[in-house]
């Protein structure tokens, strides 16, 4: 038995939304990993008594003032945390939309006796 076109369309939208959600979750996880890496770098800099650190820039190490690098890293961490919050809100909205779409699809499929 063939599925009606509107149900096929809803199913495609559902799958696209799932893919978008997966992308957002992956981006959020990448940012979280980068934050952990930057926080670990800041911890290591705190342990160092040197006022100079080395930062990778285009495949070479460049000497930099430790305080400047700490400030840069702190700003990046804060920026990434804001982005993570945004991704979390998007993730929550998409999860709700997926749940609603899933319920709608199940009802539609039951109505056509395909489920």
Swiss-Prot record:
Alphabetized Gene3D superfamilies for the sequence: 1.10.287.370
The GO biological-process annotations, alphabetized, read as:
protein folding
InterPro entries from the UniProt entry = PFD_beta-like (IPR002777), PfdB (IPR012713), Prefoldin (IPR009053)
State its location(s): Cytoplasm
Q: Which GO terms describe its molecular function?
A: unfolded protein binding
Is Cytoplasm found in the keyword set? yes
UniProt main location, coarse:
cytoplasm
The record's listing under SUPFAM superfamilies reads: Prefoldin
Which UniProt keyword terms apply here?
Chaperone, Cytoplasm
Q: Name one GO cellular component term.
A: prefoldin complex
Stated role: Molecular chaperone capable of stabilizing a range of proteins. Seems to fulfill an ATP-independent, HSP70-like function in archaeal de novo protein folding.
Name the protein family: Belongs to the prefoldin subunit beta family.
Q: How does it assemble?
A: Heterohexamer of two alpha and four beta subunits.
Annotated protein name in UniProt: Prefoldin subunit beta
């Amino acid at each position: 038995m063939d599925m009606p076109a509107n149900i096929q369309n809803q199913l495609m939208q559902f799958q696209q939304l799932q893919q978008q959600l997966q992308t957002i979750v992956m981006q959020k996880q990448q940012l979280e990993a980068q934050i952990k890496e930057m926080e670990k770098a800041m911890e290591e800099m705190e342990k160092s008594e040197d006022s100079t650190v080395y930062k990778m820039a285009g495949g070479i190490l460049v000497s930099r003032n430790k305080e400047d690098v700490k400030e840069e890293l702190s700003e990046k961490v804060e920026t990434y945390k804001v982005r993570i919050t945004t991704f979390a809100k998007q993730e929550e909205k998409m999860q709700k939309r997926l749940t609603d779409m899933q319920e709608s699809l199940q009802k539609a499929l039951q109505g056509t006796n395909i489920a």
